[in-house]
Amino acid sequence: PLATGFGSFNFDEHEGIPHVWTLSEPYGARDWWPCKDDPSDKADSLDIVIILPSPQIAVSNGKLKEQIDMPGGKIKYHWSERYPISTYLVSITTYPYIKWVDEYIGLNGDALPLEYYVYPDHYNQVYENYSKTKEMIEVFAEKFGEYPFMGEKYGHVEFGRGGGMEHQTISSMGGYSEWLIAHELGHQWWGNLVTCESFHHIWLNEGFARFSEAIWEEHIGGQNAYINYWNNHTYYGSGTIYVEEPNTTSQIFNGNLSYNKGGWVLHMLRGVMGDDAFFSTLKSYGSNDSLAYASASTEDFKLVCESQSGLNLENFFQQWIYGEYYPKYALSWDISENQELIISIQQTQAWQYFEMPIDIKIISAGQTSVLTVENDGPVQDYNLGHVDFVPDNILLDPNNWILKEVEYLSLDNMNASEFKITMHPAYPNPFNSKTTIEYFIPDINDATKPIINIYDINGNFVDKISTLGNRNEGNALTWDATGKASGTYILNLLTP
């Protein structure tokens, strides 16, 4: 059976006092209340009635409809949730909390109560950061659209687990850092307003919440802080953001893929689309008639992005969500005999090629210029035309909009030994009769007639291909294997 979650319904203690709390994501709601436990099938409303001894306080989703003293020193709490809600976002927490309130004034002047329920012994340490929540809502409302549950509340309630959980309208908190607060608040839009339709697409929750942290970082620290945030949340390893088998919490809540790389996808989309189109897309995604207060897949989000930007993003989503790894760029440049600046960009990775716009920054005599080139193959040259200067430096993606590695191969700043002759994987592979082989020979090598020898798996010579090399650019040639036996072949690139 599926692992249901992180404990579901918990009878706990804090400072020796009984403490009940729930955490149902991903599949734990079924453990403690009868429900159709599917994130795409939201309940249209919910009432939760809790009777418990005083001075315990019961906290749950939505608005407190009534609080009634009962015989025997007990209290009845009736919470009412009237926005659609996924089962895993339903929450009960009880403890004799200290409570304080604040207020957020919405974009149209409506007031939203902010309620904070904290352990008495934690009050002093959490108060300052919790009180920043109002400003965070203001920032997110401006970027994402209005807080989605204005008719009810937002707040925090402490519970007995580390980290946090974005229960609808009331985040359960096991910490109090600004970034945890921003993360769980961001989920109110991305996870609660629009919920991933299945946990295959959990990045639509967690990657977006990670991105929300970066937006708060940008607000308090500016552009450099935003860039540094992403530098500190990189992931270069294997695995796809799309969760192939969402059966366990470790598969679903992969911090590197669902969170960090998922957040990077949004950061890169921002770079590809530009701020106006990107944030317009987020607002449209959160207000879409079919997705708001409902659920979405990666394809749904892609369609909104394409509609708002006018871009074809099929390759972007295929390579970053369903593909693995990242591009490894090698940049070289030269001044031609005609005084033209030629920039060459290789993708040197052994896996998929990435199609991305790349910013190039040219620095000369204290002056800088930035241009954007479209890059989608193993080797591409860009002729920038006649120049009357020699660049002091040329930088690829200087503002770090792409998850990548960069190697600089320019003759002016690299040793000749660091130039790489590269042969890329043949494609298609497997193939029927013909396959294409691409290679790159930097112009520092005097090889004008490279040869590719082809051997079978036993090392027997099978065929030879040769062609003229072109200075500072990649070459592609086709091997026609008609009549050759099926099997595995080895390619050997030689430069005379």
Regions found by a protein language model. Name each.
Residues 79, 379-387, 474-481:
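Exposed aromatic-hydrophobic patches
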Residues 417-427, 431-496:
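C-terminal outer-membrane/trafficking sorting elements
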Residues 255-343:
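Amphipathic alpha-helical substructures
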Residues 171-227:
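Zinc-dependent metallopeptidase catalytic helix centered on the HExxH motif
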